[in-house]
Amino acid sequence: AYKELYLKEEDVMNDDDYAFLSNKLQIKLSNPNKKIKSYGAGLPDDVFTRIIDLAKINGVTAHEQFNHPDTGHLPGGWLKLDYIERAMQEYKFGGKYPRRKYDYTDMLIEFNKKDLDDLPQFDVVIIDEAQDLSWLQWQMVKRIAEKTKRLYIAGDDDQAIFKWAGARPEFLINMKGTRKVLS
């Protein structure tokens, strides 16, 4: 997504951006991109950006994610979350600040908005660990598959370990196509 959107390093939300927002809002916000670089996966440490990111990953509004039974208690409630989400959107995509800044989840969303004609074409695509893909990542796979000659998807729903980060193993389970079970 980064490459296909022609982004540069300065287009990606970084620690300075989150520090600026934290200072402006007087709330400690964490950089979700930092965890992904360090560990390969992760959600923000603070509950506010975690809920906002999970909403984007799951293709729902922040309000719907806030009301999800797994969300739990949120200090400050919905009004505080809404305030933070609006401030982040204004900072990243318009308003007073003349910039477009993306976190990794935003990149996937923008990639999925691209016209099919503008997407890369591949002879073969191999997706591994598919049981740990989120709804948003599955949308990306579907888009890429439309311009791919052969698509191989590997995964084991019994090995799904990233449900806490939005993984949706049911998409792998319900996938149509030829199946070959390896033992």
Question: Where does each model-flagged region fall?
Answer:
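Phosphate-binding beta-loop-alpha motif at adenosine-nucleotide cofactor sites
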Residues: 9, 103, 181-183
